[in-house]
Amino acid sequence: MALALITGSSGHVGSNLIRELTKQNYNVRCIDFDGDHRAYEGFDVEIIKGDITNKSSLDPIFKNVDVVFHTAALINLDRRYRDQIRSVNVDGTRNVCEASLSAGVKKLIHFSSVDAFYRFPIEEPLLEDRKLIDDPNAVPYDLSKADGQKIVMEFCEKGLDASIIHPTSI
C-alpha cells in the first residue's frame, strides 16, 4: 500500500485529503504543526510532530513516502506578517522539495493558489501560462505563493516529479 504524506494536514484541504486518501486505501502520514487533532479523529493515520520551516526535522518524516501532498501554507493578507508568510510559503516549500528529492519521493503535489498569477486581463480565462506575480510590492501571500511555485518548478529541473494545483479561495 502506498504511503502518502500530507503537510498542512489539519487545515481544510489537508483534512479532506485524509478522508479521501484513506478511502482509497493509502497509508497516510500527517505532519502535525499545531497539535489540533480534530482533523484526524476517527482515521487510522500516522501523526508526526513537525514543522516544514525546520529543514533538519524533515528527513525522517519523508522516509519511505511515495507521494507528498504539500498543502501547508500561512494564509494572511496583512503586510505586517510578510516574514512569517515567506518563511512558511517559500522557505517551507523549498524544504519540502529538498526533503522529497532526498527521500526519493515518487510524486509531489504542490497546492499553490490562483493568487500566484497576475489577475489581468480579468476578462480572459486564467490559464497556467499566465505570468506569475513578481512585484515585490504585491500582497505578501500572493507573492509567496508565486515564489513557492517557482521553487517547485526549479526542483522539477533537478529531477523531482511534481504537479502544481491552483485552487481558488477556500
Model features per residue range: what roles?
Residues A2-Q24:
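N-terminal Rossmann NAD(P)H-binding glycine-rich loop of SDR-like oxidoreductase domains
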Residues G14-N16, V90, A146:
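Residues forming the Rossmann-fold NAD(P)(H) cofactor-binding site
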Residues V45-D91, A99:
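NAD(P)H-binding glycine-rich loop region in Rossmannoid oxidoreductase-like domains
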Residues N95-Y141, S163:
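Conserved Rossmann-fold NAD(P)-dependent oxidoreductase catalytic core, especially the SDR/UDP-sugar
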Residues P136-H166:
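Active-site Tyr-X1-5-Lys
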